Amino acid sequence: MFQKHLQKASDSVVGGTLYVVATPIGNLADITLRALAVLQKADIICAEDTRVTAQLLSAYGIQGKLVSVREHNERQMADKIVGYLSDGMVVAQVSDAGTPAVCDPGAKLARRVREVGFKVVPVVGASAVMAALSVAGVAGSDFYFNGFVPPKSGERRKLFAKWVRVAFPVVMFETPHRIGATLADMAELFPERRLMLAREITKTFETFLSGTVGEIQTALAADGNQSRGEMVLVLYPAQDEKHEGLSESAQNIMKILTAELPTKQAAELAAKITGEGKKALYDLALSWKNK
């Protein structure tokens, strides 16, 4: 039965087509039969890092001609790939892990190939985003994927300020060397907001940490190993809060904005972000100045 389906997938591979192939995000066993069939028949395999892809191919006994297509040379390589397709070749595109063009190189190549009239076919597979969401326990069908969080604190805070009251989960990627700073910025805006940190998904040291932003900070501080490896963050939807005065998150946003903007402008922007009254926010800022 296994060979039957593999053969069927292989028979469906046709020349003059660019196959965008999803690869495992950690566990090599997560590759699909269709992905194996495409990689076996591909005349050219475009790889983000040829060394990483060579290891994947070796694990399955596949010998393919690898060419490097990275962010810095993708535009230039696109015309060469179009030439291969014009010759009737089967071309596969892979990234180091997951799906090409999603936070990885690939979009420019796919666009160019489509522009000149050749088929671009997705070969679906493992997804860190879907894996994290599937175990987060968040109800509902809506979510927002942000990709990698900005590297600079100021840019992160502006981004996080937009998520103070969102009614849907937000999924993002973060790197080990920035996770501490990112959590610190989150804690300034919503320290009690629930968060899941998924680390090393499908790998040996796969870990899922859930709790408030503050609790996740504490967990990482207690165990340095939890700050290692590839990370996916799932920020849970904001809960409706009823306070007699301004919410804590609104006050935190106003505090950040008043440090960068004139009070009136900060109050107007904070009101748009939080939905709170502009006058109440303005009066809050004045009370700080009068202390």
Curated annotation (Swiss-Prot):
Q: Name one GO molecular function term.
A: rRNA (cytosine-2'-O-)-methyltransferase activity
Enumerate the SUPFAM superfamilies for this protein.
Answer: Tetrapyrrole methylase
InterPro entries the record matches: 4pyrrol_Mease, 4pyrrol_Methylase_sf, 4pyrrole_Mease_sub1, 4pyrrole_Mease_sub2, rRNA_ssu_MeTfrase_I, RsmI_HTH, SAM_MeTrfase_RsmI_CS
Under Enzyme Commission nomenclature, its number is 2.1.1.198
- PROSITE patterns named in the record: RSMI
The UniProt catalytic activity note for this protein reads: cytidine(1402) in 16S rRNA + S-adenosyl-L-methionine = 2'-O-methylcytidine(1402) in 16S rRNA + S-adenosyl-L-homocysteine + H(+)
Q: Which family does it belong to?
A: Belongs to the methyltransferase superfamily. RsmI family.
Protein name listed in UniProt: Ribosomal RNA small subunit methyltransferase I
Gene name per UniProt: rsmI
